């Protein structure tokens, strides 16, 4: 789950991580009032959307007086920002962060992520702050420094100091930088984050180390023990189909193709998308119905897939392990009748009671094309959608 920058900074502040003072605003008047309350000579007006690249898209402006705050707030609120992370459709700006300006001496990058290859959290840092870390990794990988953290003992002071020295934090500010990184790590672990990214981390003219931006992502599977974080969820920033899917424990991610996919298991879902691409088709979505593919789940999955007007056909690829193929077949038939499906539908079943499942499909009287294998199913649906 993602949260907004201002929310992320509030979380970090509670862990002793230094961030600029700021207030969220939902209207132009609130933005001006927030700037008045901050009482600083310079304010930064920042669009709050769940995407990076806001500055380049015109979503971050420096205001030197209240008139400029009003002008920038009017120009940003309600507009659609298009960045490299939003896609061409962009995201509408519905809230702003009004933040005190600071005298930036140097920008850095600091981030915590899970390294799946080593099964450890890794602290990454670079003195090339303010730019995309992927860009730095591609052009100057030697400027990225990493510390792998033993989960049994957590981030150690010597590791944070080594990072601070490697990215050339001024010696007199190393202590602050170490405290910053230790607090960031505590927040990452205690709040079950999957990403904690500070870009940029800055040193200021008055000798401070602080987070000028903050991106926190949380493990959705752990939200049951973080009610405070769950309350920060902004449904306006999420895809409506993904929200609907989550109500039925379906994992749905929209894509740009025209072949709807309904699969049980994330691995099989990815393999299904791969084989559709292999036969020159384009998947319209990733949709994992999970192990308990009930008739209700299958019906809702069909509805979600069909809400995408680009879908020209559907490929159902189910392995009946926990679920029996005959039960799945009955669910597919019931769902097909309920939604009044008129698009081409190819179904591939394998596993427990597969022959009975195929028999049920064949005797349904519905226009369902049975596939003998995953490859056969992919070829058939690609052919049917033309």
Curated annotation (Swiss-Prot):
Catalytic reaction list: succinate + ATP + CoA = succinyl-CoA + ADP + phosphate; GTP + succinate + CoA = succinyl-CoA + GDP + phosphate
Cofactor note: Binds 1 Mg(2+) ion per subunit.
UniProt-listed Enzyme Commission number(s): 6.2.1.5
GO molecular function, one term: ATP binding
Residue ranges annotated for the ATP-grasp domain, each copy included: 9-244
Residues that bind ATP: 46, 53-55, 99, 102, 107
Entry binding sites for substrate: 264, 321-323
Pfam families, alphabetized: ATP-grasp_2 (PF08442), Ligase_CoA (PF00549)
GO cellular component entries: cytosol; succinate-CoA ligase complex
Coiled coil: none
Similarity field: Belongs to the succinate/malate CoA ligase beta subunit family.
Function: Succinyl-CoA synthetase functions in the citric acid cycle (TCA), coupling the hydrolysis of succinyl-CoA to the synthesis of either ATP or GTP and thus represents the only step of substrate-level phosphorylation in the TCA. The beta subunit provides nucleotide specificity of the enzyme and binds the substrate succinate, while the binding sites for coenzyme A and phosphate are found in the alpha subunit.
Subunit: Heterotetramer of two alpha and two beta subunits.
Name of this protein: Succinate--CoA ligase [ADP-forming] subunit beta
Organism: Bacillus thuringiensis (strain Al Hakam)
Gene label: sucC
């Amino acid at each position: 789950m993602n949260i907004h920058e201002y929310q992320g900074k509030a979380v970090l502040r509670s862990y002793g991580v230094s961030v600029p003072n700021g207030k969220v605003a939902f209207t132009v008047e609130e933005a001006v009032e927030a700037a008045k309350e901050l009482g600083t000579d310079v304010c930064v007006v920042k669009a709050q959307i769940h995407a990076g690249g806001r500055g380049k898209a015109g979503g971050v402006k420096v205001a030197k007086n209240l008139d400029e705050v009003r002008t920038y707030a009017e120009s940003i609120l309600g507009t659609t920002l298009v960045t490299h992370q939003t896609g061409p459709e962009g995201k509408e700006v519905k809230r702003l962060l009004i933040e005190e300006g600071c005298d930036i001496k140097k920008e850095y990058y600091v981030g915590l992520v899970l390294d799946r290859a080593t099964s450890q959290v890794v602290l990454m840092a670079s003195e090339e702050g303010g730019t995309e870390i992927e860009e730095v990794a591609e052009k100057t990988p030697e400027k990225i420094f990493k510390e792998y953290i033993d989960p049994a003992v957590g981030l150690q002071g010597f590791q944070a100091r080594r990072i601070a020295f490697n990215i050339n934090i001024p010696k007199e500010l190393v202590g602050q930088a170490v405290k910053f990184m230790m607090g960031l790590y505590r927040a990452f672990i205690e709040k079950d984050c999957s990403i904690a990214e500070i870009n940029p981390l800055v040193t200021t003219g008055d000798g401070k180390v602080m987070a000028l931006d903050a991106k926190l992502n949380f493990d959705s599977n752990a939200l049951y023990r973080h009610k405070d974080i769950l309350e920060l969820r902004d449904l306006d920033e999420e895809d409506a189909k993904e929200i609907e899917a989550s109500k039925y424990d379906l994992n749905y991610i929209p894509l740009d193709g025209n072949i709807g996919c309904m699969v049980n298991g994330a691995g099989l879902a990815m393999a299904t998308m791969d084989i559709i691409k292999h036969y020159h088709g384009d998947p319209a979505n990733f949709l994992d119905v999970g192990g308990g593919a009930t008739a209700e789940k299958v019906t809702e999955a069909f509805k979600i897939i069909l809400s995408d007007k680009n879908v020209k056909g559907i490929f159902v690829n189910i392995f009946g392990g926990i679920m029996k193929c005959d039960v799945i077949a009955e669910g597919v038939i019931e769902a097909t009748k309920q939604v009044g499906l008129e698009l081409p539908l190819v179904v591939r079943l394998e596993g427990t009671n597969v022959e009975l499942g195929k028999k049920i499909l064949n005797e349904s009287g519905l226009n369902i094309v049975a596939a003998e294998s995953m490859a056969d199913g992919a070829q058939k649906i690609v052919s049917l959608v033309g």
